[in-house]
Regions:
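Class I SAM-dependent methyltransferase Rossmann-like catalytic core
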Residues: 2-55
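Short alpha-helix
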Residues: 45, 169-195
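Class I SAM-dependent methyltransferase SAM/SAH-binding core
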Residues: 48-111
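A short SAM/SAH-binding and catalytic strip from SAM-dependent methyltransferases
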Residues: 118-133
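A short glycine-rich, Lys/Arg-flanked "PGG" loop and its adjoining helix->strand segment in the class I
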Residues: 133-148
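Conserved class I S-adenosyl-L-methionine
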Residues: 148-180
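Core SAM-dependent methyltransferase catalytic element
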Residues: 186-187, 195-221
Length: 221
């Protein structure tokens, strides 16, 4: 069975994906930020989630990648590809095996063949997606059947680059929002969301996760 999905960002309220700063993202991210964006406890929570959910020796895409991927130590991987906006940040990322500079807000079509990856992760960056449903459709395309998609976020952001609907939402609302992106994109199943380090936060930065898997149904894009 094959199903055709169309972009559905227009199913959200008008202006949902507008930002205070609509300048070119490549300009905003041109200067490398060689820092982490969550604290050590939150990093440990993200790393443990990856270790728990991504099988050893997987082929993984770190979408919207930067200076660090928070890949768990001593967890073998076959390939960890970064896709982001700053080459210097990704060049200095010790977890990545390779990387590509690409702006998904300009072009959500990911530059990879169908069914390339066992897993795709977006780490503390979904708030910046201006075409999330389109992007998630292409995440589904590059995932192998039953491949896992893990989106994590905290309460930190560059507010001028975060989309309006994200800034206006609560933490619970943001989990529901990311879940809705997956649902609208189609061909994702077993969508689950949760506050993964609630017992440690505070003092640790909070980490929320939305996780799904590519279904066996084939989708045309």
């Amino acid at each position: 069975m094959r199903t055709r999905r169309l972009p559905t960002e227009n199913n959200y309220p008008t202006g949902s994906f507008e930002r205070e700063d609509e300048s070119d993202d490549s300009w905003f991210y041109a200067s490398p930020r060689l820092v982490v964006h969550i604290d050590e406890g939150a990093i440990e929570a993200v790393s443990q989630l990856f270790k728990d959910l991504i099988p050893p020796n997987s082929t993984v895409l770190d979408l919207m990648s930067s200076w660090r991927s928070h890949w768990p130590q001593h967890h073998p991987k076959r390939r960890l590809t970064g896709l982001g906006l700053n080459a210097q940040e990704m060049e200095d990322n010790p977890d990545l095996t390779d990387y590509v500079v690409h702006n998904v807000n300009d072009d959500p079509a990911l530059p990879f063949d169908d069914e390339t990856f066992n897993a795709v992760v977006i780490t503390v960056s979904p708030q910046y997606l201006t075409r999330p449903v389109d992007t998630f459709q292409h995440v589904n395309r590059v995932l192998r059947p039953s491949g896992i998609f893990i989106v994590t976020f905290s309460n930190r952001m560059f507010p001028t680059k975060a989309v309006r609907i994200w800034r206006a939402s609560s933490d619970q609302g943001r989990m529901e929002l990311v879940s809705s992106y997956m649902d609208a994109a189609g061909n994702f199943e077993d969508i689950k969301a949760g506050f993964i380090n609630e017992e440690q936060s505070p003092p640790d930065d909070p980490i929320f996760a939305v996780v799904s898997r590519k279904s066996q149904e084939t989708t045309d894009y």
